[in-house]
């Protein structure tokens, strides 16, 4: 195959009257239109490509996209086909390529009844019985046992006035004995310091106990006043009822 000369072919391409077009463009400097440039790249690729060259069609034959490119579909179609590029890609790819052309008519990847389990009827009945509230009936009547001894007369319940929980439980307050005097060696500085700390702790504890006793007496007084106010309220309420009748 002869090497084409672009400078000589320009008069025929552009229908020029003169053949000096190539002479005007020819110069010692190598350029795109100079006959001095190597024109091997204008020849077909099959002649200059080495035997081990792989075409892009062979690279994309397995429908795998290069890792450094981005495509609209999951992969690139063959180069000899127009290809169908869309943004409605789906991970479900049929190897036979017999999918419907309308994506809305495809079968769902996650069917609603795909995870349905067959439940035992006995288990359903048991669950329904557990969810039903139990019927609440009247409380059972206590059984009164007859005894030979006469029943004690009903005595009025004692008021809470001046009554402590410890007294009802049979627990009496411990009688506190007077503490012994603090003895220490006046020649020992550590013993003197320990004695002063002990005396300060005793005074603090005594003040705390005194404060606690005052609070207990105040609570008893308030409870007594509350009980008296309740009694007065009941008295005047009963008087109002008798007056209206």
From Swiss-Prot:
Annotated CDD domains: bZIP_GCN4
Biased composition (Basic and acidic residues): 196-214
Chain ranges of the bZIP domain: 187-245
Biased composition (Low complexity): 146-159
Gene3D superfamilies: Classic Zinc Finger
UniProt-annotated stretches for the region Leucine-zipper (atypical): 222-243
Entry keywords, A to Z: Activator, Amino-acid biosynthesis, DNA-binding, Nucleus, Transcription, Transcription regulation
GO MF annotations, alphabetized: DNA binding; DNA-binding transcription factor activity
Cellular compartment(s): Nucleus
PROSITE patterns (UniProt xref): BZIP_BASIC
Biased amino acid composition, Polar residues: 27-38
Coiled-coil region list: none
Region of interest called Disordered, as start-end residue ranges on this chain: 19-38, 68-91, 128-214
Presence of keyword Lipid metabolism: no
SUPFAM superfamilies, per the entry: Leucine zipper domain
Claim: DNA-binding is one of the keywords in the record: yes
Motif window: Nuclear localization signal: 193-211
Function: Master transcriptional regulator that mediates the response to amino acid starvation. Binds variations of the DNA sequence 5'-ATGA[CG]TCAT-3'.
Family membership: Belongs to the bZIP family. GCN4 subfamily.
Self-association and partners: Homodimer.
This protein's name: Cross-pathway control protein A
Organism annotation: Aspergillus niger
């Amino acid at each position: 195959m002869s090497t084409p000369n672009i400078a000589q072919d320009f008069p025929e391409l552009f229908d020029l009257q003169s053949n000096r077009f190539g002479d005007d463009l020819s110069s010692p400097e190598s350029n795109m239109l100079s006959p001095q440039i190597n024109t091997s790249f204008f020849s077909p690729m099959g002649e200059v490509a080495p035997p081990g060259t792989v075409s892009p069609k062979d690279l994309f034959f397995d429908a795998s996209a290069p890792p450094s490119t981005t495509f609209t579909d999951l992969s690139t179609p063959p180069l000899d086909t127009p290809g169908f590029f869309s943004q409605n890609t789906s991970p479900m790819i049929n190897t036979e390529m017999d999918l419907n052309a309308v994506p809305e008519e495809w079968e769902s990847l996650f069917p609603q009844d795909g995870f349905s389990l067959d439940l035992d009827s006995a288990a359903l009945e048991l669950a329904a019985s557990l969810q039903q509230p139990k019927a609440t009936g009247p409380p059972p009547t206590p059984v009164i046992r007859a005894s030979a001894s006469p029943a004690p007369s009903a005595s009025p319940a004692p008021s809470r006035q001046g009554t402590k929980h410890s007294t009802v439980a049979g627990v009496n307050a411990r009688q506190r004995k007077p503490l012994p005097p603090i003895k220490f060696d006046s020649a020992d500085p550590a013993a003197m310091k320990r004695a002063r700390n002990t005396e300060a702790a005793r005074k603090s504890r005594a003040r705390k106990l005194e404060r606690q006793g005052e609070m207990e007496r105040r609570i008893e007084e308030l409870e007594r006043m509350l009980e008296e106010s309740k009694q007065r309220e009941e008295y005047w309420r009963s008087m109002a009822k008798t007056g209206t009748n």
